[in-house]
Amino acid sequence: MGVTVAVAGASGYGGGELLRLLLAHPEIKIGALAANASAGLPVTEVHPHLPDLEGRVFTDAAALAGTDADIVFLALPHGQSAAVAATLPDTVRVADLGADHRLVDPEAWRRAYGGEHAGTWTYGLPELPWARAEIAASRRVAIPGCYPTATSLGLVPLLVGGLVEPADLVVVAASGTSGAGRSATVNLLGSEVMGDLTAYKVGTHQHRPEITQTLSRAAGMTVTVSFTPVLAPLPRGILATSTGRATPGTDADAVYETLRAAYAGEPFVRVLPPGRWPHTAATLGGNAVHVQGTFDPETGRAIVVTAIDNLGKGAAGQALQCANLMLGLPETAGLTAQGIAP
């Protein structure tokens, strides 16, 4: 094991999923595990599903200053990553699962999250046409949000291929409750969530500027996106339905073949056979993205549906995928595209 990693924010859902993946990585040794609110607690008290970490104890994030780890993962709440990153040596690679360094426009950051913008890092979505070389050459990588991951992987090929109009994109995406983190809030209690679907932050969700940023780069111009997130009664998973007004000549075959060609050879993206639509359960526990697309002649819109595990490809799995690229390791090391069923 030639690579040592440290994790800040290791007690949350994203941090716990990252630890599970790191334990299975053939080249990685797990170093310091920081979690300010859980400092001093045994790791297995917080994550009883990780018995191989028996005997390990969470430290305070301040203990990471001057770390000799090869890479540090920041799995902290939004707005907290920048302060920890500033204490780390420039020689240490850092992958930030939070939002602090995703956005290029400081004003967009202030509108979405409040406070001062901490600067922009390389955007870590390897399947984007321009991304792999940028990630591999970077020491600081911002891991995308879960909704932007699912949405971008559906719409980017259609924008690059000129199949949809950039000015008319609509996304409705449902997410499980773990996307909101581990903090206890009334609206996330089981008795509140079970048997219920509800839209939230309609027109104001903090991920919309991130979605717009990525899709605009793909289109080569500023896009317009309507984004409606939906809270679903399941622990994890995202199902995103993304549509765009089709350009002349676009049909169902063109949409499908564009997606298939864009992701040919990708280890984690599966364009499903025609007529088979993505299920969130099929991606559970993996780093997979399941994709299907078609064209609706009644409305003249191209439609793409994507499913991911929001804690996998939407967070920890993607972070490890980027870390592998940053460290010069096989991109798929410690990861799987296989899900867990039922």
From Swiss-Prot:
Pfam families according to UniProt: Semialdhyde_dh (PF01118), Semialdhyde_dhC_1 (PF22698)
EC number(s) recorded for this UniProt protein: 1.2.1.38
Transmembrane stretches, start-end: none
UniProt GO BP: L-arginine biosynthetic process
UniProt-recorded Gene Ontology molecular function terms: N-acetyl-gamma-glutamyl-phosphate reductase activity; NAD binding; NADP+ binding
Active site residues per record: C146
EC top class named in words: oxidoreductase
Main location: cytoplasm
Pathway assigned in UniProt: Amino-acid biosynthesis; L-arginine biosynthesis; N(2)-acetyl-L-ornithine from L-glutamate: step 3/4
Keyword hit for Amino-acid biosynthesis: yes
Annotated catalysed reactions: N-acetyl-L-glutamate 5-semialdehyde + phosphate + NADP(+) = N-acetyl-L-glutamyl 5-phosphate + NADPH + H(+)
CDD domains, per database record: AGPR_1_actinobacAGPR_like (cd24148), AGPR_1_C (cd23934)
SUPFAM superfamilies the record matches: Glyceraldehyde-3-phosphate dehydrogenase-like, C-terminal domain (SSF55347), NAD(P)-binding Rossmann-fold domains (SSF51735)
Sorted UniProt keywords: Amino-acid biosynthesis, Arginine biosynthesis, Cytoplasm, NADP, Oxidoreductase
Matches recorded under NCBIfam families: argC
Family per record: Belongs to the NAGSA dehydrogenase family. Type 1 subfamily.
Role, per record: Catalyzes the NADPH-dependent reduction of N-acetyl-5-glutamyl phosphate to yield N-acetyl-L-glutamate 5-semialdehyde.
Name used for this protein in its record: N-acetyl-gamma-glutamyl-phosphate reductase
Organism annotation: Frankia casuarinae (strain DSM 45818 / CECT 9043 / HFP020203 / CcI3)
